[in-house]
């Protein structure tokens, strides 16, 4: 099981839907979050993409030197990037980071934003373009280890003599991750990607998506790994966790929800449609209505696009829910919480010891790394918990 965190390059706050409790997103703050994730033992961080975010490649590059082991899941965007340029970017980043790049293939689902970026393709055409893009990208990188060039002629993209002189550290190329809920997305995942990601839907729905992608891949003689994107709200007691969830949306007003849902409704993203359906397009507001599956809460999606659900509960409960998802075949969990710095620590301290995961040792010196807690009465270190042994 691999646990990832998230860099909030589109903003961070104690509350959703308001500037109250917000904090500036600058390099120093992102370095704090990345450094914490690196030290705490998270496998890597997802860096979001889109016009609401800072550029993910610039952000990721600025954090290479501030981290030692942390991996970076960074987006390539068919239609915005050319595949040969994206291949060079990926190879350079992988080389400079010592093999710490993961690539997130993002097709896009907001027609208005895409047209602003010069992409005038419908849903089906975007997936055709994405399939051509990632095929060219993969071939250029794979052939770079032997110095070969690549030719390709497609409906949307063509290259002649495409060649990369500096190969990536990872062979044949940095792993490709990808998320999408439509049939076209599942077909692309089955044919070309290494890891398929889903947003946090109820386990039964996630199981159906996994089965569909897995079956499609098997027919092509391939296997695909699986991951999930979730928020987490964990506190020492169940009541405290639900209180924190309610507090997170306590500043959200009706006008903000209506405006957000109208924006989501114009998108042609199947994943976004499924997220909105979990709270009936913003109509559901109470805890009972928003708890769509045990401890799975859809309140985040009232105003946040993309991943809109959170696991809410005490450490044992949240760990148990994660293990339930893992039993479906998921082994990659991309998590986040508000604010992202504090919650990175909280989740690692409270939940990591309860998960069936290989601990990531980030600090040299073995026993010097702790955790110990403050020395008692200037005499002894506190007793070590059984879960820490």
Swiss-Prot record:
Disulphides: none
GO molecular function term, any single one: alkanesulfonate monooxygenase activity
Keywords attached to this entry: Flavoprotein, FMN, Monooxygenase, Oxidoreductase
Signal peptide: none
Chemical reaction(s) catalysed: an alkanesulfonate + FMNH2 + O2 = an aldehyde + FMN + sulfite + H2O + 2 H(+)
A GO BP entry: alkanesulfonate catabolic process
EC assignment: 1.14.14.5
Gene3D superfamilies, per database record: Luciferase-like domain
Superkingdom: Bacteria
Annotated InterPro entries: Alkanesulphonate_mOase_FMN-dep, Luciferase-like_dom, Luciferase-like_sf, SsuD_RutA_monooxygenase
Zinc as UniProt keyword: no
Enzyme class: oxidoreductase
Pfam families reported in the protein's UniProt record: Bac_luciferase
HAMAP family reported in the protein's UniProt record: Alkanesulf_monooxygen
Family stated for the protein in its record: Belongs to the SsuD family.
Role this protein plays: Catalyzes the desulfonation of aliphatic sulfonates.
PANTHER family: ALKANESULFONATE MONOOXYGENASE, ALKANESULFONATE MONOOXYGENASE-RELATED
Protein name as it appears in the record: Alkanesulfonate monooxygenase
Native species: Variovorax paradoxus (strain S110)
């Amino acid at each position: 099981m691999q646990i990832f965190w998230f860099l909030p390059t589109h903003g961070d706050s104690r509350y959703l839907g308001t500037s109250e409790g917000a904090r500036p997103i600058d390099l120093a703050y992102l370095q704090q979050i990345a450094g914490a994730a690196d030290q705490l033992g998270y496998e890597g961080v997802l860096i979001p993409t889109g016009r609401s975010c800072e550029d993910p490649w610039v952000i990721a590059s600025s954090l290479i030197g501030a981290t030692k082991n942390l991996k970076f899941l960074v987006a390539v965007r068919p239609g915005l990037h050319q595949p040969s340029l994206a291949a060079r970017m990926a190879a350079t980043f992988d080389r400079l980071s010592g093999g710490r790049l993961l690539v997130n293939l993002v097709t896009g689902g907001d027609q208005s934003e895409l047209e602003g970026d010069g992409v005038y393709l419908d849903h089906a055409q975007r997936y055709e373009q994405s399939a051509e893009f990632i095929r060219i990208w993969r071939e250029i990188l794979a052939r770079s280890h032997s110095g070969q060039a690549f030719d390709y002629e497609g409906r949307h993209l063509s290259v002649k003599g495409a060649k990369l002189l500096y190969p990536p550290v990872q062979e044949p190329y940095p792993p490709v991750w990808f998320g999408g809920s439509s049939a076209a997305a599942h077909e692309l995942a089955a044919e070309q990607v290494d890891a398929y990601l889903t947003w946090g839907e109820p386990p039964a729905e996630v199981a159906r998506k996994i089965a569909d992608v897995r079956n499609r891949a098997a027919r092509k003689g391939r296997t695909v790994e699986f991951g999930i994107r979730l928020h987490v709200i964990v506190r020492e007691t169940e009541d405290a966790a639900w209180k924190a969830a309610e507090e997170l949306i306590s500043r959200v007003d009706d006008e903000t929800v209506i405006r957000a849902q109208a924006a989501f409704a114009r998108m042609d993203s199947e994943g976004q449609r499924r997220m909105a359906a979990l709270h009936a397009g913003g109509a559901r507001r109470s805890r009972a209505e928003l708890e769509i599956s045990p401890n799975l809460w859809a309140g985040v999606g009232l105003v946040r696009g993309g991943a809109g659900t959170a696991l809410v509960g005490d450490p044992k409960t949240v760990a148990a829910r994660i293990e339930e998802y893992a039993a479906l075949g998921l082994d990659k969990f991309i998590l986040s919480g508000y604010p992202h710095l504090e919650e990175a620590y909280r989740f690692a301290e409270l939940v990591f010891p309860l998960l069936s995961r290989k601990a990531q040792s980030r600090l040299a010196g073995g026993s010097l790394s702790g955790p110990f807690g403050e020395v008692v009465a200037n005499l002894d270190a506190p007793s070590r918990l059984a879960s820490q042994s």
